[in-house]
Amino acid sequence: MRRMFGDCQVLSSMAAMAGASSSADALFASPLIPNPALAGFMSSSAAMPFHHFSNAAATLIPKEEGLMGGLHVAKDEEMDLEMDMELSGGSGSAHLDGLLSFADVDDDHKPQHSGHDQPPDAAQPSGAAGGNAKKKRYHRHTAHQIQQMEALFKECPHPDDKQRLKLSQELGLKPRQVKFWFQNRRTQMKAQQDRADNVILRAENENLKSDNFRLQAAIRNVVCPNCGHAAVLADMSYEEQQLRIENARLKDELDRLACIATRYGGGGGRQPVLSTSALSCISAPPPVLMPPLDLDMNVYSRHFAEQAPVMGCGDLIPPPVVPQHDGAAAYMGAMMAPVQEQDKQLVVDLAATAADQLARMCRAGEPLWVRQRGAEVMAVEEHARMFSWPVDGAKQGDGGAVARAEGTRDNAVVIMNSINLVDAFLDANKWMELFPSIVCKARTIQIINHGAASGHLGSGTLLLMQAEVQFLSPLVAAREVVFFRYCVHNADEGSWAIVDFPAEGFEEGLLQASVVRCRRRPSGCIIQDMPNGYSRVVWVEHMEMVGEEKPLQPVFRDYVASGAAFGATRWLSILQRQCERLASELARNIADLGVIRTPEARTNMMKLSQRMITTFCANISASGTQSWTALSDSTQDTIRVTTRKNTEPGQPSGVILTAVSTSWLPFTHQQVFELLADEQQRCQLEILSNGGSLHEVAHIANGSHPRNCISLLRINAASNSSQNVELLLQESSTHPDGGSLVVFATVDVDAIQVTMSGEDPSYIPLLPLGFAIFPATSPSPAAAPTISSSTTTTTGNGNGETSSTPPRNSSSNNNNADELLPPNGCLLTVGMQVLASAVPSAKLNLSSVTAINSHVCNAIHQITAALKGSAGGAGGEPASDQ
């Protein structure tokens, strides 16, 4: 009786533990974010999907609580299992099949258990429990059963009762066996994922410990460069530290003013009066520390009273409150200041020269500026005759290739005052947010002069900056440039000038070898305030390509050479759109539209959408950190594929596969934009809708055009239920001259609830897809493009020197209206992303690359077919904008 009672007690406890495990799976399950646009292309492929476990990890049987503890397999069965594993090919899923394939054949009076849910005494002889008890018999699931359950598990790790019942009937199993198999499979997957995360966290912890020890040792060995003694603060108070910092800052400011006074205020043979620190700078080599105004953009806090200038023995240890930047990186940046103290006055003189040239270029007309198809293009020879640069670089670039110049000018009215615009131009992070589709990277290397006496950046500010500008296609290389940015205020005219000029001789060691080398000639904008809070902006863009450029696809040769890809028109169109967007974000008289109830929820939704746009633009361009691969050797192939391993928040963790293609279409960019921005028309494209319809549940207007908006769409799919609703976040944006964007990403209901509640949405994972459309003339007026299964082929002249800027449909200057010919087509960039594997260390399967390539090609063909149908059978003839 005692033995039987003990057996019952063990069985009941195991049943309770199994129930707990099931509830834990329900609580802690983390399904991958679905992607409706690509939901069908992986499943339709004949290739096997990704396995999320490596061979080495799959052979380790995890120790599961409550489920694995009761599994006892006889020695002969273990040998059979090992032989089956060896014959299975060694894949991770095959090993898991071996672990999950045991099931018992019981009599009709006992419940069945599958795999790891067997009672602990199941393998004991029947005589130990009773004389007439039958001995349990175990068997493995068949290969077909395992394959079917694995297939369902990859689609739905948590099947409901109907799915389990249907599967059990198809496989000849009992529903309880299917239920237990799925429980064990989920438990093993969670254990493997936890183990991998634990290894990563341990490695990161060790790295942080080693960095901490190294920095502590470096602090203990710090030596003052002025006196050579150890720099120790001892028991110095916080107030004394601040006083020392302020005192050193004032000394340096006095030295700077003394240098300026000796240059411009003195005369004759009078000797300049210099302070002791200034004399030490002349007689001794420059110190290893950064000058006081030589601060990294990520370090300074817009108030220079908090920054550490020239430091003495007691000032080398930073104050207790450190700005948001890594201390070691700031210290290294201080030792590598490109512009030393003795060179600063030269840079200030160059800034004044560049500002004068910019003002003259903004006022000049012909022959400096000539109109070509509605755009103002610089006459390079006339510019060289009118303007000279004191530190002019050689006209011969790398390899003896002649530098090619691009110069354009445009003007526009934006809905933002000059103060806010100047503040955005002088802050690298705000500058990137203001131009998300063209500035992919930007940082301030050094602050030469802060300008304003109050400590804020303003008139007279002089910065050394580094930026990387992009075009939304991997077929056009990004351009990296190091330049000085100077801000000056003209009080008489009430205008501000933001002028950039080349950093000749100061960019050594700052440029990457993987991007196009450029020299930014005096360029920039003049901002004039208007009475109604608007600003009129005149923009001049002048870039010079140095060395031999990479060959471009025929579809881009004339477009890039004319300056349309990186010219003033594109910069101004993006500025107009972002100013409209920021103005709508600050508006508070917005009616309740959909599920967005509060202004805070509206602001959070716009921030989430802005991050989606920025992520999409960065992931489809040819920035210096991404390597793109062509799928064929044909020079006409326009599809490029890349992969990246992501572990940072904000995007799904794992291996992300991206495919991008750019094609020229014989339709206006507004026609293509209307097709792709309208969710109802887009649902007609089978490759993009996946058979489901969309219903708008929230709408945020953020521009003057009706299509400039953010939408939250409900995906009406057959898989939806009351507990599982798929949502789509979409933002569409258009400008008559600068082109259009349509970007969308799937989000779950929980993420939207977090956004609506006012919490930080920066950690919500987004994997955006979308389209970029730019107005462009045909690459070859004599030949129409043809679209093949994988690319758009064109015939161009190939000289790369003609100027065929896409004309402007609306301009403030209508004197040459007869030259404003409408564009006869557009450039369409299609960008697709898919989470290939949730494990960052997984290997990419070639079948997945083939599948996403086919998906992009089919999308282009369906878009072209839909546009031809809407044009009334006009074939490849472009439609008019009128």
Curated annotation (Swiss-Prot):
It comes from the Eukaryota. PANTHER family: HOMEOBOX-LEUCINE ZIPPER PROTEIN HDG5 (PTHR45654:SF11), HOMEOBOX-LEUCINE ZIPPER PROTEIN MERISTEM L1 (PTHR45654). Residues 104-144, 782-820 are annotated as: Disordered. SUPFAM superfamilies: Bet v1-like (SSF55961), Homeodomain-like (SSF46689). Residues 340-584 form the START domain. Belongs to the HD-ZIP homeobox family. Class IV subfamily. Signal peptide: none annotated. Probable transcription factor. Its main location: nucleus. It is found in: Nucleus. Keywords: Coiled coil, DNA-binding, Homeobox, Nucleus, Transcription, Transcription regulation. Gene3D superfamilies: 3.30.530.20, Homeodomain-like. It comes from Oryza sativa subsp. indica. Residues 134-193 bind DNA. The keyword DNA repair does not apply. Residues 200-263 form a coiled coil. Residues 133-143 have a biased composition (Basic residues). Pfam families: Homeodomain, START. This is Homeobox-leucine zipper protein ROC3. Residues 782-816 have a biased composition (Low complexity). PROSITE patterns: HOMEOBOX_1, HOMEOBOX_2, START.
